[in-house]
Structure formats: C-alpha cells, structure tokens
Amino acid sequence: MIDPMLPLPGLSRVGGKSVVACFDGGLLSSDAGILAVREVERRLGVADRLAACLEDPRASEQIIHGLADIIRFRLLMIAAGYEDGNDATSLRRDPMFRMALDQLPSGRALCSQSTVSRLENLPDPRALLRVARAIVDLYCRSLRQVPKRIALDIDDTFDAAHGGQQFRLFNAHYYDEYGFQPIVVFDGDMRTATGGNEDHRNPTQA
C-alpha cells in the first residue's frame, strides 16, 4: 500500500531552492499538480519548440515575458482546466503557476491576459504551419521505433466563442453557436499527431 504521506521527489529547483511536494497539508491548492505537468513539459521542450516557430516583433530591450514563457503559461493553464485566456488575470499571481514558470511564490507576476491574447493573435499562416510541423516532430520523437503503419483519426472539435472574436463563424451543427472548429489528428493510441485550423464548416459539410 502506498503511503499518502510520502513526498513527491524529483522536482526541479526554483531560484536555487529545493521544491518538495507533500500530501499532508490539506487542501491548500487545487493547482499543485501543474508542478508535475511542468516536469513533463520541461522534458519534451514543448513551449521552446513552439516559440521557435514564431517571430517576436517586440523590441528585445522591452521584453519582460519571453514567448516560451507565455506559451508555457498558456499550456499549463489549459492542462489545469483553465481553457479561457481571461483566466490569466487571476492566475498570474498564483504561487503554483509562478513556481511552474521558474518564479518563487513571492516573485513577479506572470504575463497578463492581454499578453496572452496578443500571443494567440501573433502567428501568421506560415507560422501556424511551422507550429503544426513542430507538433508532428514531437509526435515522431515519441515513437520508440519506426512503426510499420500508423492509423490516424482525423476529427474536428468545437470551441464556442463568447464574444466578437476574429474569424468566428456561425455553425448550425453545434447547438447553433458561433465559434471555431479546429481539426485534430490522433493515432490509434490516442496520441496527438498534429492539429490545424478549419474552414468553419463541419467536415460533413465540406
């Protein structure tokens, strides 16, 4: 039987200080699990790979939050169930998210919602293609050996819009709502192979 009081070892140091996660402190935070997610992201280098696909138009001397850190924050938000970029406003001072972004709990705040929004509007079509290729590269690196064949499941998913976002369109197939409909590609083991933008129609309508 596993002792629930044992600490979780192997977490990376932050600001030169050791990080120890224990399970004997009660319900202190609902987002402590992102420290484990952070370790996975570090090993795969997802944020750094995606950031390398983008061109940062900002003046280097004025940059506070690098593209990789903004992407990493957004990835961790989604992993923790905060799918809306507006949640960055309340999470930018959350101690767990600060630690996941290599900041001490008392360190500076993470990027704001407006910074996240600018990031999401930054990529042009060529950058999006580079991002898709980077995801494919991550997928290929996850394979222990070259398979004889790969079965791909290509499907769409719907992301409802709750305002006047750019490029939102009405889709009668999903509850008569406005939103976005990206395409996602999985293999037979349900690993994400890649994703892409959409033409705002259901595949059955295309």
Predicted regions mapped to residue ranges:
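Dynamic "connector" segments at or just before major functional cores
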Residues: 1-204
